[in-house]
Regions:
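AMP-binding/adenylate-forming catalytic core of the ANL superfamily
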Residues: 108, 127, 294, 413, ...
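Conserved AMP-binding/adenylation subdomain of ANL enzymes
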Residues: 231-250, 260-299, 310, 314-317
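Conserved AMP-binding/adenylate-forming core of the ANL superfamily
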Residues: 20-22, 31, 39-84, 88-92, ...
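ANL superfamily adenylate-forming
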Residues: 8, 134-204, 315
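Conserved beta-loop-beta connector loops within the AMP-binding
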Residues: 390-410, 452-453, 515-519, 554
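Gly/Ser/Thr-rich phosphate-binding loop
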Residues: 275, 295-303, 314-375, 388, ...
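Conserved ATP/PPi-binding loop(s) of AMP-dependent carboxylate-activating enzymes
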Residues: 382-386, 397-433, 473
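Conserved adenylate-forming
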Residues: 66-71, 192-205, 210-253, 275, ...
């Protein structure tokens, strides 16, 4: 689409373009914040504060240590650490050493870990001690030469660290004996000084990150992301919040940092504006998360709908035991944000919860609802500054479509990745040349429509279309209908094999605590709101649904389980 109907609907103070973008590496934001706000907290973890001056120094020393271990510009270095100060130290240390960050999901299975180690070719990885044995088991047959190991107690306040060592370290698997060749991170930091940091001229087009996709469609692929991509998206997100106060904000860092969303919209954004990061290593521990909100009064809280919904329904929150009024702005991503979740959370906090959209191939945001302006129900919002979008026909993949027509979202912008690591065929199908010779277009695989104001709406994933008896059925539409049922807490919908229709619709439901729901009630609810061919023919009630670490329901896992059960009969 040549015009940009969304521009008139931007909030006051949000520019149409940020060009020209600064030509600096991502870690320059940390150095700038350390110069502007040296004594401001950078991370807060269980009461232990690391200031921006200290974080800059620690990451310099980490860079020196990595260089001394043989890390050269362009080398991939792994991180296998939850949301703790060590992640921030290591992340910026790798970048300052000229390395490429490869952040691994701590919940990955050994098979997934081995795949990522082999695919990325990393030779060194920094790992939290309680995950050490898992990496050692995955190490044989990979290029991984040595591990740098950190202990969670290293960044706890002294008394807490002592108690942790006495009462929990062995019990919870944090105490380990290192194999020959592996090293303690704390020893390396003590051994090196910031002055030893390698003197490198890291360029914007240098690779900063191999961001592996969440693996919702199979083994993950590594998206090659440059410093320029990450710097641009950090600034795009900053521009979207013109009321943000430099050097004063506090970010609740509950979304995983190994995920592009947490890494950019959480950490990189916060560091760029001198915000404090309140580190939450396990967001499923709602008591700990709520205690952090109560104590440290965060103003920014990037998250996912399942997390906001869990807070809304927590009995202590309902009883008014926690003060959530400090929260001003929350960008929700990774899954659809239901209106009920949004309204309840905004009533609890007095802040604004608004939905955005992004992907690992454009880390991390390309669209967002406005902070001040109208948020439209079911919409992912408008393109961020400098993001161009087209909606292309599902029939030929070429013909541009207009307002409220449904097709594949295709986009380009300064945050778009450079391709998949060692996967030229997948790169060529995802990044396609522009007929006019401009920057290539990213084919997202998401089916969308755009309204007359330039707000976009996700219809579904192209690959998850259900073809039932010749009809096209989008799972998300059915999920939204079922999620609106007052007794339904979570829902997943997918196509399963059917001898007569080819595929048929199945729904998996989690019922709210204390409620009961029957299959007949579910079908009656859908029958009033959906065409007959869209109504689920099979219903399964479950206590929980399989999800990615950022709360996205794994439809393919539900289908796999269904097929296994069917085959066993």
């Amino acid at each position: 689409m040549e015009s940009k109907p969304w521009l008139p609907h931007y909030d006051d103070g949000v520019p149409a373009s940020l060009a020209p973008y600064p030509t600096k590496p991502l870690h320059a934001f940390l150095e700038e914040s350390a110069a502007k706000y040296p004594d401001r907290p950078c991370t807060i973890f269980k009461g232990r504060v690391i200031t921006y001056r200290e974080m800059n120094d620690l990451s310099d020393r980490m860079a020196a240590a990595l260089a001394a271990q043989g890390v050269k510009p362009g080398d991939r270095v792994g991180i296998f650490i939850p949301n703790t100060p060590q992640f921030v130290i290591v992340f910026y240390g790798i970048l300052k050493a000229g390395g490429v960050v490869v952040a691994t999901n701590p919940l990955y299975s050994p098979r997934e870990i081995t795949h990522q180690l082999k695919d990325s070719g990393i030779e060194r990885m920094v790992v939290m001690s309680n995950f050490y044995q898992r990496i050692k088991e995955a190490q044989p047959g990979t290029q991984l030469k040595s591990l740098i190991v950190t202990k969670i107690k290293e960044q706890l306040p002294p008394v807490l660290g002592l108690l942790f060592g006495l009462l929990r370290e062995k019990k919870e698997g944090h105490y380990v004996e290192l194999a020959a060749g592996d090293l303690w991170m704390q020893d390396l930091l003590a051994r090196h000084t910031a002055a030893e940091r390698p003197k490198l001229d890291v360029q914007p087009d240098d690779v900063a990150l191999l961001q592996y996709s969440g693996g919702t469609t199979g083994l993950s692929k590594g998206a090659v992301v440059t410093h320029a991509c990450l710097t641009a998206n950090t600034l795009q997100i900053r521009s979207w919040l013109p009321g943000m106060r430099e050097g004063q904000e506090v970010t609740l860092m509950a979304i995983p940092l190994f995920h592009a969303y947490g890494m950019v919209a959480g950490m990189a954004f916060a560091v760029s504006c001198g915000a404090a990061l309140v580190m939450v290593p396990n967001p499923r521990d709602l008591h700990d998360l709520l205690e952090n909100i109560n104590k440290y009064r965060p103003t920014l809280f990037p998250g996912v709908p399942t997390l906001y919904n869990a807070i809304n329904n927590h009995p202590d929150v309902k009883a008014g035991k926690y003060n959530l009024s400090s929260i001003r702005a929350c960008i929700s991503g990774s899954a659809p944000l239901l209106l009920e979740t949004k309204n309840t959370f905004e009533k609890l906090t007095g802040g604004k919860l608004f939905e955005g959209y992004g992907l690992s191939e454009a880390p991390t945001a390309t669209h967002c609802n406005p902070f001040q302006g109208p948020n439209k129900e079911g919409s992912i919002g408008m393109p961020l500054p400098d993001v161009e979008c087209k909606i292309l026909s599902l029939e030929d993949g070429v013909t541009p479509l207009g307002v409220n027509e449904i097709g594949e979202l295709v986009l380009r912008g300064p945050q778009v990745f450079r391709g998949y690591w060692n996967m030229p065929a997948e790169t060529n199908s995802t990044l396609q040349a522009d007929a006019a010779g401009g920057a290539p277009w990213l084919f997202t695989g998401d089916i969308v429509r755009m309204d007359e104001d330039g707000y976009f709406y996700i219809v579904d994933r192209k690959k998850e279309l259900i073809k039932a008896g010749g009809f096209q059925v989008w799972p998300r539409e059915i999920e939204e209908v079922l999620a609106a049922h007052p007794k339904v807490m979570e829902v997943g919908v997918a196509g399963i094999p059917d001898a007569y229709r080819g595929e048929t619709v199945k729904a998996w439901l989690v019922v709210r605590p204390g409620e009961t729901l029957t299959e007949a009630e579910v079908k009656a609810w859908c029958g009033d709101k959906l065409a007959k061919f869209k109504v689920p023919t099979q219903i399964e009630f479950r206590s929980e649904l399989p999800k990615t670490t950022v709360g996205k329901i794994l439809r393919r896992e539900l289908v796999r389980e269904h097929k296994e059960k069917a085959a066993a009969k």
